[in-house]
């Protein structure tokens, strides 16, 4: 919360071995919560691994063009999709920082329907050449429509395959039903090491 403005409790944080695993798990949670598969919008160009994960599990994925402020909300509205996958801190691969105005537009879009969500991939928000980072999109969300995904692979070590997902309360019941089917993909040892690393203040 202190560095990114993310609002959550420990129970809302789901740990997994990489963003791709968490994205597949999230898709199952959304299917459970809404009784069927949802469709996705992705920035164009986009993080290709995430694109191929969603296409590989049979989801409809609509590429949405960018402008100087990030994903075009006008183009997003022209496509009948449920989930917008965005990289607002540093758009991958173009590096665009999504403006506050565009973030609010996205939140408005998501709030217009119960089955709309935003996946915020905050993969490298810790790195900046100048200025303070804009707070995470999740921290601006008042309706529980943003799923925040972060990773320690960029900020600590590439060999540490540990990512995390912050679920809104509205998806926690689905996680309790679906998530318990799977073993955790990150060892308890690695989790405890990172926990101690953060608690001792070395991550700041």
Predicted regions and their residues:
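Conserved core of the PLP fold type I
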Residues: 1-114, 126, 132-140
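Generic structural signal for secondary-structure transition and capping sites
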Residues: 89, 115, 145, 202-203
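Walker B catalytic acidic pair
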Residues: 121-122
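Flexible, active-site-adjacent loop/turn segments at secondary-structure boundaries
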Residues: 125-127, 135-138, 150, 154, ...
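Short aromatic-enriched loop/helix-cap "lid" or pocket-rim segments at secondary-structure transitions
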Residues: 129-132, 159-161
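PLP-dependent aminotransferase class I/II
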Residues: 146-204
């Amino acid at each position: 919360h202190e560095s990114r403005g993310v609002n959550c409790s420990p129970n809302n944080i789901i740990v997994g071995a990489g963003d791709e695993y968490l994205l597949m798990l999230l898709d199952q949670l959304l299917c459970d919560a809404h009784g069927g598969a949802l469709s996705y919008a992705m920035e164009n160009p986009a993080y290709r691994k995430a694109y191929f994960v969603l296409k590989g599990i049979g989801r409809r994925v609509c590429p949405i063009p960018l402008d100087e402020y990030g994903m075009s909300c006008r183009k997003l509205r022209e496509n009948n999709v449920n989930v917008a996958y965005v990289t607002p801190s540093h758009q991958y691969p173009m590096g665009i920082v999504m403006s506050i105005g565009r973030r609010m537009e996205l939140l408005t879009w998501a709030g217009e329907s119960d089955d709309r969500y935003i996946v915020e991939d905050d993969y490298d928000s810790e790195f900046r050449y100048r200025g303070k980072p804009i707070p995470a999109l999740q921290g601006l969300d008042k309706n529980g429509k943003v799923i925040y995904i972060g990773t320690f692979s960029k900020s600590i070590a590439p060999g540490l395959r540990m990512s995390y997902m912050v679920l809104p309360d509205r998806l926690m019941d689905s996680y309790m039903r679906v998530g318990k089917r799977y073993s955790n993909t990150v060892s308890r040892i690695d989790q405890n090491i990172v926990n101690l690393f953060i608690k001792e203040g070395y991550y700041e």
